[in-house]
Every structure is written in structure tokens, then in C-alpha cells.
Regions:
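Structural signal for the C-terminal ends of transmembrane alpha-helices
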Residues: 2-7, 65-73, 164-173
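Immediate flanking context of iron-sulfur cluster ligation sites
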Residues: 28-45, 64-67, 130-131
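C-terminal TM-helix exit segments that contain a strictly Trp-centered aromatic cap at the helix terminus
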Residues: 30-39, 89-105, 125
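Interfacial segments of alpha-helical transmembrane regions
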Residues: 14-25, 72-94, 164, 168
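Iron-sulfur (Fe-S) cluster-binding segments and ferredoxin-like electron-carrier domains
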Residues: 52-67, 117-121
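A hydrophobic membrane-anchoring alpha-helix module
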Residues: 133-173
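Non-cytosolic membrane-interface motifs at loop->transmembrane helix junctions
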Residues: 44-54, 80, 110-113
Length: 173
């Protein structure tokens, strides 16, 4: 186990980079398992913004998995950190949009729109992305709340943590 000194926080022990990448993958797999549990067992249907956030979590998981197998050196770690940042920033933007929609007064919430699968079947892909990013009434429904945060709030926290963790992996050397 290696140590990374942080000025005001003291020492934080970090595992070797390959193990850290593997742990990142396991966390993403756990988040996806939780999402499927909420959907299929608890009956919470994901809105289109939720589905796009799931894509971001899967992308992050695949980047972590590739890093675990590759075990990159310093330059490779910077590349993985950049990829993790792009994927987590994209997810954070989606989650931020959903948190904003959830904060709107009821009379300002957009009307419910088409389901994602229907949009994918009938609209050009660019229009699907535009409509999903605009949000709809179902995206404003908080559904499940824990410690005052909706699922979108928790995923936003996850995406921010991943952006930071990706660059912490670079500091391993």
C-alpha cells in the first residue's frame, strides 16, 4: 500500500493503481446492480435522463476495467484520468440537469414526453439527444430520496467523486 500526502488532510492510503482501477469497476457494477434493483424490484421506471446517466456509469466502469487489465504507467494513467474526467463530466452535466428539473416548482416542470425506446425507434439520433437533454415531467419526479438527495443528486455526487479519483490515480507515482 502506497501513501499519498495531501497538505491539510494528512495521509490517505491508496492501493496500487491496478487494484484502484478494479475497485472503480466494482463500484460501477454495484451502482448498475442497484439501478436495476430499483427498476425491476422496487418498480422505479428510469426517465430518459436516468438512462443517459446509466450510460455514463457504464462508460466509467469500462474505463476502470480497461485500466485494471492494462495497469498503465504514468502517461497511461493520465490518459485514463482524462477519459474518466470526460465520462464523469458528461454524467455530472446530465445529473445536474435532472437535479435542476427536480428543483422546479410544479407549474414550471416540462410536460411528460415520449419514452426513450419510442424516441430511439422514431426520431433521428440528434433529435433524441436534444429531447432527452430538454428533460420532461418524468425527469422531475424524485421517486427515491435518501439523506435528502434524490437518485440524481447521488449520481451527481458519484460523478464528481470519479472526476477527482481519476486524477488521484495519476498521483500514484
Amino acid at each position: 500500500v502506497m501513501a499519498l500526502g495531501l497538505s491539510s488532510l494528512g495521509l490517505i492510503l491508496l492501493p496500487p493503481r491496478r487494484i484502484a482501477f478494479a475497485l472503480g469497476f466494482v463500484v460501477c457494477a454495484g451502482l448498475m446492480a442497484w439501478a436495476f434493483w430499483l427498476e425491476h424490484i422496487e418498480g422505479l421506471s428510469p426517465c430518459p435522463l436516468c438512462m443517459f446517466q446509466r450510460v455514463a456509469v457504464v462508460a466509467i466502469g469500462l474505463i476502470f476495467l480497461a485500466g485494471a487489465f492494462h495497469d498503465p504507467g504514468r502517461v497511461g494513467a493520465w490518459i485514463y484520468a482524462g477519459l474518466l474526467f470526460v465520462a464523469s463530466a458528461s454524467g455530472a452535466a446530465l445529473a445536474t440537469r435532472q437535479v435542476w428539473l427536480q428543483s422546479l416548482p410544479k407549474d414550471q416542470v416540462p410536460a411528460c414526453g415520449m419514452g426513450l425506446s419510442y424516441m430511439m425507434d422514431t426520431l433521428p439520433f440528434v433529435d433524441v439527444i436534444r429531447r432527452v437533454l430538454e428533460g420532461s415531467g418524468e425527469c422531475a419526479d424524485k421517486g427515491w430520496v435518501f439523506l435528502g438527495l434524490s437518485i440524481a443528486g447521488w449520481t451527481l455526487s458519484f460523478f464528481v467523486a470519479i472526476a477527482v479519483a481519476g486524477f488521484a490515480l495519476v498521483k500514484r507515482d
